[in-house]
Amino acid sequence: MSKFRDPLHVKVLDDGKHYEVLQTFTYYLYSNKEALLKVEQGFITDFASVPRVFWSIYPPFGRYTKCAVLHDRLCVAFLNKELWNDVAVDKDKLPVVLQNRFIRRYEADQLFLESMKAIKVNAFTRCVLYACVRVYAIFKYGFKA
């Protein structure tokens, strides 16, 4: 079963909109109980990138905050053409199909959804947030993203 292994420790940056991860935290990948993905100390996030007009319904932080930070890290990896190996604690424990392969935006979005389910974010919220990231990705990068 997927789960986060560590607490999330952050500090607010001077701009008041971004946060720095103070301690590396990890997430067990769904398909392999030994495979851990990491968000490194020093990573900068904005939590959930929700337009301000919707903050009363879905604020940038909430039960899904760790999921949003993991998603941000995977999206940065996608944009920088990083391999799954780069976000794994131990690349040899990754499923073979992910080893030495670039992260796809679709996979980052799927893990966002999976991680929200793992920490029991309610189904409606999961669907709304997942739909939002998919629509954004399709408009920004096309259907192959």
Task: Give residue spans per PLM region.
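Extended terminal accessory/targeting regions
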Residues: M1-A145
